[in-house]
Amino acid sequence: CHARENGNDTVIPILPEALHLLGLHQNPRFHLYDTWEHTLLAIDNSPHDLAIRWALVLHDLGKGLPEIRKLNKEGQPSDPGHEAESAIMAQAILTRLGYNNSFVHLVTWLVAQHMRFAPMLLTGERTLLRWVRSEATNSGFRTQAELTQAYSLLVEVFLADMGATHARENEQLMAEGRLLGRQVVELVRTRMPVCSKDLAIGGRELLELVHQSEIKSILFYLLERVQSGNLPNEKEALLTAVHKHLKRKATISSGDNV
């Protein structure tokens, strides 16, 4: 990009961090193109959404860096952990370009998580649940709706990235990827509350059962149970769990007083 200041043209580097991707070789077992060509094709595969497009521009910036690039036993390039380094770079770039904190957080998260789907094609729902629960408690998204939206965007990033590799020639594999994407979004939307406000009951219902001072701890207990996958986020199930929890506490308390 050029800018004119005091009668002089000045070159302004927009994304110097991406220059090393041009012509950067990738493992031909998985990739048809060099890293920059792969990036451009992934962008071309994606919906016209700013967060998705930025995530794809930045998702492989860590590839080829001296501390990341390795050779596997076949002598082909490998970039383990590039997504974490790419996320660090993405956060710095988007902050430099003046994007707001929530947008920077979202895109950085998309970049950091974009490699998580591939192993899930083999391991299935158990690993999905563990991953989603971890993100519900640690990702920084404030509500179940926010987390669901983030995962919906991540699925688009994953599919666009996947479609810029040899996988694009394997319709069954692409179909499995799309199915996995639908499964994870549905899991987040229906089974993974992020905060107590996402629960099917709140303080008003609990006031009929416990003192106001206990409500916060009871809601936290229910949130953990639902996130762990052993309690459905349904009003009757939650109320039953509260009754059982209070009964156990009363039994323990009476035993301590004997």
Language-model segments: what does each one mean?
Residues 23, 35-38, 57, 150, ...:
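N-terminal alpha-helical segment
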Residues 12-15, 104-112, 215-223:
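Short, well-structured alpha-helical segments
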Residues 40-172:
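Divalent metal-dependent catalytic cores for phosphoryl transfer on phosphate-bearing substrates
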Residues 5, 21-24, 60, 106-116, ...:
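A glycine-rich phosphate-binding loop feature that marks nucleotide/adenosyl-phosphate handling sites
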Residues 9-23, 49-56, 63:
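Active-site-adjacent "gating/activation" loops or surface patches in catalytic cores
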Residues 15-41, 67-76:
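Active-site flanking loop/helix segments enriched in acidic
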Residues 90-92, 165-258:
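Charged substrate- and nucleic-acid-binding regions of tRNA-handling and nucleotidyl-transfer enzymes
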